[in-house]
Design a protein with these regions (language model features):
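Short metal-coordination and nucleic-acid-contact micro-motifs, chiefly zinc-binding Cys/His arrays
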Residues: 5, 13
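C-terminal cap of thioredoxin/glutaredoxin-like
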Residues: 6-7, 24-32, 102-156
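A structural signal for isolated positions on well-ordered beta-strands in alpha/beta enzyme cores
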Residues: 8-10, 39
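Short alpha-helical
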Residues: 18-19, 132
């Protein structure tokens, strides 16, 4: 008997989004009982909404903060491979949405330590060095569905 062919599921998420976190957890649970292979990819709420002149000031300020985890996720992927994205994403999102940690310096440092990645990756949070790659990943997720949807995006 041959194993069933796996269906590829590409999930595009921003750690700051609670809806993405719930969807990611659901996808991982579904992967336990269905023939799917789920890949976690970065999208950015800041990239999606940052050029909207109608945003309230507090939302615009929050979007600046939202760049930080996606930059670190991207830096980690580029330095250590795609396989670190799921655990790092889950560590960040759990800290933000379950543990209610609001200080993203703490979220990032603790998540990197939890998954055994170098602490110096945290420097990517405040660097624009990875922004082009964040945008590229964001657009790989968003372009097929249009920019009038938010996070998460799932491609099957």
């Amino acid at each position: 008997m041959t194993a069933p062919e796996l269906t590829a599921v590409d999930l595009y998420v921003d750690p700051s989004c609670p809806y993405a976190f719930q969807t990611a957890r659901w996808v991982l649970e579904a992967a336990k009982v269905r023939s799917i292979s789920a890949t976690c990819n970065v999208m950015s709420l800041a990239e999606l909404n940052g050029n909207n002149p109608d945003l309230p000031a507090e939302w615009a300020e929050w979007l600046v903060k939202a760049w930080r985890p996606v930059r670190v996720l991207t830096a980690a992927r580029l330095a250590h491979g795609q396989e670190v994205v799921w655990p790092l994403y889950l560590a960040m999102a759990t800290a933000i949405h379950i543990d209610k940690v609001e200080d993203y310096d703490v979220v990032i440092a603790n998540a990197l330590a939890e998954v055994g990645l170098p602490a110096d990756l945290a420097a990517a949070a405040d660097s624009t060095e990875y922004d082009d790659e964040v945008r590229a990943s964001h657009h790989r997720g968003m372009d097929p569905v249009g920019m009038d949807v938010g996070t998460p995006v799932i491609h099957v």
